């Protein structure tokens, strides 16, 4: 069974490991940099930009895969699935039109409005800077609501800024909106939304167009520094619990979050003819219940590493059920284990990361800790590893309790050396307790 994998980060490393648990799988990977972990698992690799559709086509023609799995969002936004399907290759991932659920935040908000999906919020999209945009930000403030400023398109998870966090006040928010128009960031359109108060969590679903099968809930940590301080990143690490929900969630929260995603899948069927692949909802748990911050059209990174580490099924079976519309016929099951994932990143990340610096990873020592290792934004050159500026290496602890899973992941970070740092507080009970207290406070 030949599988074409597109992408070369830690998320794709987790996908590669999950696929290779099936001995029939032969992996062929197209990625931008040489990820040593993925390269080892692959029969053949091609180094090219994941958005270079000509390179994808050429590699697919050569390999003739039975199935393709798409890791990152950028190629989905370029229409890589449309291309592969035209070539007669089934792909786990949405077509360009359906991928807009991530690649076009205005499309996502309008979908919620049109189909009256629960968990929506106040928003307005703008094509140019002007009085209307300024007034909307001021109107939110008058209602006691802070503004969130987002480019409408893709920015690699780093374009969102919030008043009271990255933006000091409304004047800075307006200035940032202006900057988005001037630089063309994320397509140069701006979405202004209300800031939600609460605790963030994520939920993934495997979708075949009709059926959605859910994974455990995961909590990501987007802030760069301990205690949830610093710049917003692509995610510094994440954890999941043995009971598959999060400690600050009620059964009602679980039910509502799943209903929102089910309604979204139905709406996408009506609007664009269906969605297949992985759907990843990023939620804010507010005192009114879960609300959607945004959707992603693929696995979360880091969350894929938590989820695929405890998936009981043969992942190939799940992928085949997605493309063959057979998800209703299988049970997707996960072990009742806790997982903690921690990223080791270059110093200065995300604002001013060191690039091209060497990093050393003692794989044997990490293996002895019991942790799972995934290489991310590194490039292997002549046997040495160099950081390329984004998150470098991830380690995952899996155990019966969060405390033990956290200890395993933390122990493993000691064997990664270089101009690097990580958040040691992810998965620690003090930080989780803070989240529980925040939710209790809001619910009072």
Swiss-Prot record:
Mn(2+) 1 binds at residues 282, 294. Pathway: Purine metabolism; IMP biosynthesis via de novo pathway; N(1)-(5-phospho-D-ribosyl)glycinamide from 5-phospho-alpha-D-ribose 1-diphosphate: step 2/2. This is Phosphoribosylamine--glycine ligase. Keywords: ATP-binding, Ligase, Magnesium, Manganese, Metal-binding, Nucleotide-binding, Purine biosynthesis. The gene is purD. GO terms for biological process: 'de novo' IMP biosynthetic process; purine nucleobase biosynthetic process. It comes from the Archaea. It comes from Methanocaldococcus jannaschii (strain ATCC 43067 / DSM 2661 / JAL-1 / JCM 10045 / NBRC 100440) (Methanococcus jannaschii). ATP binds at residues 140-202.
């Amino acid at each position: 069974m030949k599988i074409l994998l597109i992408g070369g980060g830690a998320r794709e490393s987790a996908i590669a490991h999950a696929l290779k648990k099936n001995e029939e799988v032969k992996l062929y990977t197209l990625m931008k940099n040489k990820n040593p972990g993925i390269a080892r698992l692959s029969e053949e690799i091609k180094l090219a930009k994941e958005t270079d559709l000509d390179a994808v086509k050429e590699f697919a023609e050569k390999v003739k895969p039975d199935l393709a799995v798409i890791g990152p969002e950028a190629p989905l936004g370029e229409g890589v699935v449309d291309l592969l399907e035209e070539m007669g290759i089934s792909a786990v991932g949405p077509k360009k039109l359906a991928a807009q659920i991530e690649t076009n935040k205005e499309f996502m908000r309008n979908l919620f409005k049109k189909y009256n999906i629960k968990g929506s919020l106040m928003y307005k999209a703008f094509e140019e800077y002007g009085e209307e945009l300024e007034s909307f930000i001021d109107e939110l403030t008058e209602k006691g609501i802070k503004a969130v400023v987002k480019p409408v398109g893709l920015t690699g998870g780093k374009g969102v800024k919030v008043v009271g966090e990255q933006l000091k006040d409304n004047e800075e928010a307006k200035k940032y909106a202006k900057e988005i128009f001037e630089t063309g960031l994320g397509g140069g359109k701006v979405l202004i939304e209300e800031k939600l108060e609460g605790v963030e969590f994520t939920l993934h679903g495997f979708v075949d167009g009709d059926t959605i099968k859910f994974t455990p809930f995961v909590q990501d940590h987007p802030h760069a520094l301990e205690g949830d301080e610093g710049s917003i990143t692509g995610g510094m690490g994440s954890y999941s619990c043995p009971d598959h929900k999060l400690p600050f969630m009620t059964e009602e929260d679980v039910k509502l979050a799943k209903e929102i995603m089910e309604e979204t899948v139905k709406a996408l069927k009506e609007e664009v003819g269906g969605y297949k692949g992985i759907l990843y909802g990023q939620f804010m748990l507010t005192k009114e219940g879960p609300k959607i911050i945004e959707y992603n059209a693929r696995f979360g990174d880091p969350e894929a590493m938590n989820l695929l580490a405890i998936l009981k099924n043969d992942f190939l079976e799940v992928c085949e059920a997605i493309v063959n519309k057979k998800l209703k016929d299988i049970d997707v099951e996960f072990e009742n284990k806790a997982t903690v994932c921690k990223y080791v990143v270059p110093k200065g990340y995300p604002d001013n990361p060191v690039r091209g610096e060497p990093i050393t990873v003692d794989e044997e020592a990490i293996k002895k800790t019991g942790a799972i290792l995934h290489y991310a934004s590194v490039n292997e050159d002549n046997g040495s590893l160099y950081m390329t500026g984004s998150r470098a290496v991830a380690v995952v602890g899996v155990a019966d309790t969060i405390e033990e899973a956290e200890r395993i992941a933390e122990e493993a970070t000691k064997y990664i050396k270089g101009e690097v740092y990580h958040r040691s507080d992810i998965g620690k009970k003090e930080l989780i307790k803070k989240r529980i207290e925040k939710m209790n406070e809001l619910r009072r």
